[in-house]
Curated annotation (Swiss-Prot):
PROSITE patterns: PROTEIN_KINASE_ATP (PS00107), PROTEIN_KINASE_DOM (PS50011), PROTEIN_KINASE_ST (PS00108). GO terms for cellular component: membrane. Keywords: ATP-binding, Glycoprotein, Kinase, Membrane, Nucleotide-binding, Serine/threonine-protein kinase, Signal, Transferase, Transmembrane, Transmembrane helix. The lineage of its organism: Eukaryota, Viridiplantae, Streptophyta, Embryophyta, Tracheophyta. Serine/threonine-protein kinase that may function as a signaling receptor of extracellular matrix component. SMART domains: S_TKc. The gene is WAKL21. It catalyses: L-seryl-[protein] + ATP = O-phospho-L-seryl-[protein] + ADP + H(+); L-threonyl-[protein] + ATP = O-phospho-L-threonyl-[protein] + ADP + H(+). Residues 1-21 form the signal peptide. Its EC number is 2.7.11.-. This is Wall-associated receptor kinase-like 21.
């Protein structure tokens, strides 16, 4: 992504000629702004704007009008620290008010946290991204969607009910963009549609006001253009000139077209209702993601065009892999940075929950062996996540020889196990409340240029109980990947840090054996790798599960370290969680195994460096 000052939210500030679909006799102009009835710059118009002598723009109070449509007015709200909340009163008028939907008011100095929208913009974002260094008060979100049953916000709810002193800015949202510094207003004329002043061939839309009253808007029907209100001219039918159509052909096909039209209308009605439902769901999703993005200043926001360009329009040649929840593509931004972009397969609530969860968790932790979330994108109900690119794929791909590279040496396997354990231990012990990954598996362990491991895919992760509480687990429905799932968690629905320990134990067995976790070509009692490993290790038959690819380099010291790792895996795979070690204990055991195998710390790095160099000389980086 180019280094421009917009990595969090899309800043959209328009200054252009303003027009509306409802026409009237003549128009009024204020330098750069052209308006038509019912909008104007004098008392003779129902909805009056002022004309800025400095910019030549239409303004409402002190706020510039950016756009006027058949139903809305968009105004610019520049981010300002400690702007009095009562400044918003300028946008509550007899014929206009902020829309209840697709709007979020950003406020400061609140006595209590607003419950309607759980989002908070950190001071770091305000200071660094908006260049407002003196803005010390945190910014929170006031979502107008729950304030009233009307179509517009209530001034009393915003000014008095919010308990906030300052109005920082606003956010308006559409299906394809999130706009900071922009507020959407609804407009109307007095009276209900029953007392309409709409012209012939115009439809009336009612507007429910916050005081219980009604307003209305007039719009020319589809196929008509002109003046929707009762002023001279009215709405007239649009005339399209068509050449080369014979009159008799038109008459002959008219009957057929009428029949087809009836069928089309019925089908269109069905799909339109479904589309409305989907559109409403997308709007709800967008509002949720919007708050998450606004509340996580460490997560940049990319546009869909940037994502599309980076992946070459999601070309198959850039596809890195696909899973249950989405497809991952390799991408490259203009600054030549390589990234991995996950495109979710589904747009349902479950998928969105996982996106929100991953944004929250990855933006709150940092560790060299956790994959970094570089940004995200939301376009028309479809979320995308942008990660750092891991050129050597996944641990699973190497253990299953899917990349055409030499088998991983024992030194590399042991190093990957140690790094992965360190990352999980960090999530369990260095974060409060702890984070339980819930999907530790070899395909979620990525490898960088130097084969350092990084854990990915936090969509199923959950926060544990804070260390201030004595509870050892949380109750939740089991989720994860078959073969890696803690059997006791599956039995009693109690998730704890020991659930990740079990999954990591399965990964250790994969590292030793190179076997698939679930393999139906094995005997029935050995389909599950964990069951097979527990049986063989318990009977002292570790040699039965050692990867044949390791036979060429095996020696007494290496054989001893494999046995020690197998015994550690055996403890991790205990059915009862209380019998399993903690991740901190596992990292300590792995450190001892490394020292036994390498002899010294310096020898460890020398051996790894030599192995990595040989691999990189034989096989070019992807």
């Amino acid at each position: 992504m180019a280094e421009t000052p917009q990595p969090y939210l899309i800043f959209v500030f328009f200054v252009f000629t303003l027009t509306v679909a409802t026409q009237t006799t003549g128009s009024v102009k204020c330098k750069t702004s052209l308006l038509r009835y019912p909008f104007g710059f004098s008392d003779g118009y129902p909805i009056r704007f002022n004309c800025s002598e400095i910019t030549g723009e239409a303004v409402i109070g002190e706020f510039a009008v950016q756009e006027v449509t058949n139903s809305n007015i968009y105004v610019e709200i520049p981010p300002v620290c400690k702007r009095n909340i009562r400044k918003i009163e300028q946008l509550f008028r007899e014929n206009l008010a902020p829309s209840k939907l697709q709007n979020i008011i950003l406020v400061q100095g609140c006595k209590k946290q607003n419950k309607s929208s759980n989002c908070l913009i950190r001071n770091k974002f305000v200071e660094n991204r908006l260049n407002l260094s003196k803005c010390k008060s945190p910014v929170s979100c006031l979502d107008g969607a729950t304030t009233t049953t009307a179509d517009v916000m209530s001034l009393g709810d915003v000014v008095n009910g919010s308990g906030c002193k300052y109005w920082f800015s606003s956010i308006s949202q559409s299906q394809v963009s999130v706009n900071l510094g922009r507020l959407k207003l609804d407009w109307w004329l007095k009276g209900s549609c029953s007392n309409t002043t709409c012209s012939e061939n115009a439809d009336c839309a009612k507007v429910k006001l916050d005081d219980g009253g009604l307003g209305h808007r007039c719009t020319c029907r589809e196929g008509f253009s002109g003046k929707a209100f009762t002023v001279p001219g009215g709405c007239h039918r649009l005339v399209y000139k068509r050449k080369g159509l014979h009159k008799l052909v038109v008459l002959g096909t008219a009957g057929i077209l009428v029949g087809v039209l009836v069928i089309v209308v019925l089908i269109a009605t069905y799909f339109f209702r479904n589309k409305q439902s989907a559109s409403s769901e997308r709007a709800s999703i967008a509002n949720r993601l919007l708050c998450e993005l606004a509340g996580n200043s460490s997560v940049p926001f990319y546009t869909y065009k940037e994502i599309e360009k980076a992946t070459d329009s999601f070309s198959d040649k850039n596809m890195l892999g696909t899973g249950a929840y989405g497809t991952v593509y390799a991408g490259e931004f203009p600054n030549s940075s390589c990234v991995a972009i996950k495109r979710l397969k589904h747009k349902d609530t479950t998928s969105i929950d996982q996106v929100v969860n991953e944004i929250k968790l990855l933006s709150s932790v940092s560790h060299p062996n956790l994959v970094r979330l570089l940004g995200c994108c939301f376009a028309d109900g479809e979320p995308f996540l942008v990660y750092e690119f891991m050129p050597n794929g996944t641990l699973y791909q190497h253990l299953q020889h899917e990349r055409g590279q030499p088998p991983l040496s024992w030194q590399l396997r042991l190093a990957i196990a140690c790094q992965t354990a360190n990352a999980i231990a960090h999530l369990h012990s260095s974060v409060n409340p702890p984070i339980y990954h819930r999907d530790i598996k070899s395909s979620n362990i990525l490898l960088d240029h130097e084969f350092n491991s990084k854990i990915s895919d936090f969509g199923l992760s959950r926060l544990g109980m804070s260390t201030d509480f004595e509870a050892s687990h949380i109750s939740t429905a089991p989720q994860g990947t078959p073969g890696y799932l803690d059997p006791q968690y599956h039995q009693d629905f109690q998730l704890s840090d020991k659930s990740d320990v079990y999954s990591f134990g399965v990964v250790l067995v994969e590292i030793i054996s190179g076997f698939k976790v679930i393999d139906f070509t094995r005997p029935y009692s050995e389909v599950n790798l964990a069951s097979l490993a527990v049986d063989r290790i318990g009977r002292g038959r570790v040699v039965d599960i050692i990867d044949p690819c390791l036979n060429k380099e095996i020696n007494p010291k290496m054989f001893a370290s494999i046995h020690n790792l197998a015994e550690l895996a055996f403890r991790c795979l205990s059915f009862h969680r209380n019998m399993r070690p903690t991740m901190v204990e596992i990292t300590e055991d792995l450190h001892r195994i490394k020292l036994m195998h390498y002899g010294t710390e310096s020898g460890k790095f020398k051996n790894r460096s030599e192995i990595d160099m040989k691999r990189q000389q034989s096989f070019p980086r992807e």
